[in-house]
């Protein structure tokens, strides 16, 4: 019986990782995957590592690890390794892949001389980054949890917490992102403010949809893009993902559908 192994992402697994497991699903997923893989490669020198779990030669899960200073998802901190996302195929859960990936992340953190590992965990029944799993792996919730308020995400996620595992007692606690968005109107225009990052497949994919839909409206709509992949942008606005139309946030949790984006812009135009 094949056993679970872990490796760094390579040419044989980058398609699985880049498409967030949506292999051979659509041209859109493939295009998104290419953008993400390019970003992964560019970030390698800054400490990004993608760990892949395999059963035999079949990839079944992955984990992203990077210095917290360059992580586009939060939390904010220093001298820690951030794990913004860990995923294991549903049919392969409970077999040790997730724990094996966490063990690799710990090795990577020590290899890079970090004082610990930090992640965002959620207390809910949804699959994304369950806090209970990280606690079973030895992570501790730092301070109090807080309610998820982002439009769309709050439909799936309830309370979020910063969880960390410390190797060095001098490690400084990371901090929650605190969104700092202020709408700036432009006379006679509908303004779309897009906060996104290339790292997250969901954010990456919906950002491209927003660009395409906004282009349909020509000069009537102004698009402002804010990429959380730039640490300075993330620290200024502290929003890794969000779509605002004339200051009002829209969201679905999953990738914003084109029809939904189009309808929201049309309603704003009609209102004005």
Descriptions of predicted regions:
Residues 1-55, 181, 200-201, 206-212:
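Short amphipathic alpha-helix that is part of the acyltransferase structural core
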Residues 40-52, 61, 82, 235-238:
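A short helix-loop-beta-strand connector motif used in the catalytic cores of GNAT acetyltransferases and
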Residues 74-90:
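Conserved acetyl-CoA binding element of GNAT-fold acetyltransferases
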Residues 88, 94-109:
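Conserved acetyl-CoA-binding loop-helix of GNAT-fold acetyltransferases
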Residues 109-123:
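Conserved GNAT acetyl-CoA-binding A-motif
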Residues 120-121, 135-159, 250:
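Conserved catalytic-core motifs of GNAT/GCN5-like acyltransferases
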Residues 147-181:
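C-terminal "cap" of GNAT-fold acetyltransferases
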Residues 247-272:
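Non-catalytic, surface beta->alpha helical segment in thiol-disulfide oxidoreductase systems
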